[in-house]
Swiss-Prot record:
Record's protein name: NAD(P)H sulfur oxidoreductase (CoA-dependent)
Catalytic activity: hydrogen sulfide + NADP(+) = sulfur + NADPH; hydrogen sulfide + NAD(+) = sulfur + NADH
EC number of this enzyme: 1.8.1.18
UniProt keyword Transferase, yes or no: no
């Protein structure tokens, strides 16, 4: 008996990490299916995390695409539409604005992978020449072109999150005078506890005019930006970066009646299915659950975004797989000071109602007798009732292996005893015999 293969059409809105992961996975499992991707820009499988390094000049703009469009079209058989903006979504079809007009396309399965957009403050002057966001590859192109055509000496960055910090480094590395204006009492305050951010702030203040607890009132200039005015002063500006957060692009999902979750992003289950049959969501537009708390969270980061797309594509093609959730594992740096975390901070754990204990330690990345050792600080958060490790933060040098190991521990529900007895590698050129992460577990007690 011959098996008849039923060809399905999968439409994916968004050609970023999640969208192309979903598209590639469907084509791998169901090569005979018609997979269409509509990307509003000319950039596909792009890496927004690389924008600061293009602005700094250490990476060419074209490298922000992981694969060129031809790879997806010719090698993977994906029907990729660039500069194609989806303007309407309804049951069974989407309407798309393309270069040659508007067209409608039918779908059997639909994936929202249309990401997030910058939250631009509603103040005067944000539309002046020389004022930018740093969200997509075209932003990197525009910033570089502006710097080449105009004299830029004074840069003002509005916002003290990851993007603000990384963009500050990009301009400091080029010898620019940088002012960072932060509304809150410290940088990265939503992601890290104070004793951790204090260390990177100390480094930041050596190179940047850091203005905390100031509110930007307006941006002024005639033909182009000239200064930024806050409730505490004025700052000369030849270029301004608005790094004041992002929001999920949920407008198209609302057209279809898709449920929006409590975080403001699209609600999804473990298969990345939305509340509407045969409709999925992945990446920065979708919310998920936190591995530790089980609560709904919106964590717009590249690694989970890619995996969400993979999971969505797998389930659409009939291979069931569940997305377990996120820990919010992150890492960044300012010059030679790195900062990262995984799991819950002390602030977050207390907010969730945990009875906790914490430890904050300073260690070296090498034995005292081996050259090249650098300082590293670690903070751990533990549930008093179960001794389960809830979160780890790190700042200083060579933090990545500690944060990654801690993330694996959290995924496996490690206690402090489990962490202490983890058989980590040791040799003097790489680490001390008592690795800082093991020392942290010992100080946290078990």
């Amino acid at each position: 008996m011959r098996v008849v293969k039923v060809k399905k059409t999968v439409v994916i809105i968004g050609g970023g990490a999640a969208g192309m992961s979903a598209a590639s996975r469907v084509k791998r499992l169901k090569p005979e299916w018609d997979v269409k991707v509509f990307e509003a820009t000319e950039w596909v499988s792009h890496a927004p995390c690389g924008i600061p390094y293009v602005v700094e000049g250490i990476s060419p703009t074209e490298k922000l695409m992981h694969y060129p469009p031809e790879v997806f079209i010719k090698k993977r058989g994906i029907d990729l539409h660039l500069n194609a903006e989806v303007i309407e979504v309804d049951t069974g079809y989407v309407r798309v604005r393309e270069k040659d007009g508007e067209k409608s396309y039918e779908w059997d399965y639909l994936v929202f992978a249309n990401g997030a957009s910058p939250q631009v403050p509603a103040i005067e002057g944000v539309d002046l020449k020389g004022v930018f966001t740093a969200d997509l590859p075209p932003d990197a192109v525009a910033i570089r072109e502006y710097m080449e055509k105009n004299r830029v000496e004074d840069v003002v960055i509005v916002g003290g999150g990851y993007i603000g910090l990384e963009m500050a480094e990009a301009f400091v590395a080029q010898g620019k005078r940088v002012t960072m204006i932060v509304r809150g009492e410290r940088i990265l305050r939503r992601s890290f506890d104070k004793e951790v951010t204090d260390i990177i702030e100390e480094k930041l203040k050596q190179h940047v005019n850091l203005r905390l607890q100031e509110i930007v009132l307006r941006i002024e200039g005639k033909d182009r930006v000239e200064k930024v005015v806050t409730d505490a002063g004025e700052y000369r500006a030849d270029l301004v970066i608005l790094a004041t957060g992002i929001k999920p692009n949920i407008e198209l999902a609302r057209q279809l009646g898709v449920r929006i979750g409590e975080t403001g992003a699209i609600w999804t289950n473990e298969k990345m299915q939305t509340s509407v049959e045969n409709v999925y969501a992945a990446g920065d537009v979708a919310e998920t659950k936190h591995v530790i708390t089980g609560r709904r969270v919106w964590v717009p980061l590249a690694p989970p975004g890619n995996k969400m797309g993979y999971v969505a594509g797998s389930n659409i093609a009939g291979k069931e797989i569940h997305f377990p959730g996120v820990l919010g594992t992150t890492v960044t740096k300012f010059l030679d000071v790195e900062i990262g975390k995984t799991g819950l901070t002390e602030t977050e754990a207390l907010k969730e109602g945990y009875d906790i204990r914490t430890a904050f330690i300073k260690a070296s990345t090498r034995p005292h007798y081996y050259p090249g050792g650098k300082e590293i600080w670690l903070k751990g958060v533990v549930d008093n009732e179960t001794n389960r490790l809830l979160g780890v933060q790190a700042v200083g040098a060579e933090i990545l292996p500690r944060i990654d190991a801690a993330a694996a521990m959290l995924m496996a529900n490690f206690t402090t005893k489990d962490a202490f007895f983890t058989d980590l590698a040791y040799a003097p050129p790489f680490a001390p015999v008592w690795d800082p992460l093991v020392v942290l577990a010992r100080v946290l007690k078990f």
